Amino acid sequence: MGQKVNPIGLRLGINRNWESRWFPSKATLPENIGEDYKIRKFLKTKLYYAGVSQILVERTAKKLRVTVVAARPGIIIGKKGGEIENLRSEVTKLVNKDIAINIKEERKAGSSAQLAAENVAMQLERRVAFRRAMKKVIQGAQKAGAKGIKVSVAGRLGGAEMARTEWYLEGRVPLHTLRARIDYGFAEAHTTYGNIGVKVWIFKGEVLQKGIQADKNEDTSPKKPRRARRGK
């Protein structure tokens, strides 16, 4: 189960929070979901090069607040905040509602699974070898303090005629452990050979109750790097 399901959805209410935070009524539920989708799709496309890792949508009775977490917030804000005002007006026109936009900096961009997946996808589109792109992202996550990372790419890798899946794993990524803080990201690389899917799982440690310590017998010593494996 843990191997198949989205690890973020599996941990909602345990150690992850929802990215859409509002209480719907039956009358407004479809409209609110549609608006959230439009806002996220627009901002992801418009701010792609700003390194957006997360978009939070909060609603109150009269206000809609959008929080954008990005690795390069300066691109979004612009000189003297001019760009963010233009962005707010564009999103307001999109959903016909008054919107407040907050920008937060992603302090540990190397340990963000979504940014790592987009980084690999961008390199694949630039014709970088997929193994080199995967190893580079793994090294960046380890430097940022990740306890484990798994990167998987699937498609016509290197222009091969038959599609296949290959992945690298460094450290531990316990997908079945619900208290484990697993970050997950997905991106697609649009190449001349077709689309290549990129998935990234990053293990950031375990969330334990107060007064409980992690198992001291657990082996935390560094292990030899594992070779790339081909999926079935």
From Swiss-Prot:
Record-annotated disulphide pairs: none
Keywords assigned by UniProt, alphabetized: Ribonucleoprotein, Ribosomal protein, RNA-binding, rRNA-binding
Residue runs in coiled coils: none
Entry keyword Nuclease: no
Top-rank taxon: Bacteria
Gene3D superfamilies: 3.30.300.20, Ribosomal protein S3, C-terminal domain
Region named Disordered: 213-232
Biased composition (Basic residues): 223-232
InterPro entries per record: KH_dom, KH_dom-like_a/b, KH_dom_type_2, KH_sf_prok-type, Ribosomal_S3_C_sf, Ribosomal_uS3_bac-typ, Ribosomal_uS3_C, Ribosomal_uS3_CS
Gene Ontology molecular function, alphabetical: mRNA binding; rRNA binding; structural constituent of ribosome
GO CC, alphabetical: cytosolic small ribosomal subunit
Basic and acidic residues composition bias: residue spans: 213-222
GO BP terms: translation
Domain KH type-2: from-to ranges: 39-107
Keyword Ribonucleoprotein annotated: yes
Function: Binds the lower part of the 30S subunit head. Binds mRNA in the 70S ribosome, positioning it for translation.
Record-linked PANTHER family: 30S/40S RIBOSOMAL PROTEIN S3, SMALL RIBOSOMAL SUBUNIT PROTEIN US3C
HAMAP family: Ribosomal_uS3_B (MF_01309_B)
Family: Belongs to the universal ribosomal protein uS3 family.
Subunit and interaction comment: Part of the 30S ribosomal subunit. Forms a tight complex with proteins S10 and S14.
Protein name, as recorded: Small ribosomal subunit protein uS3
Chain's gene name: rpsC
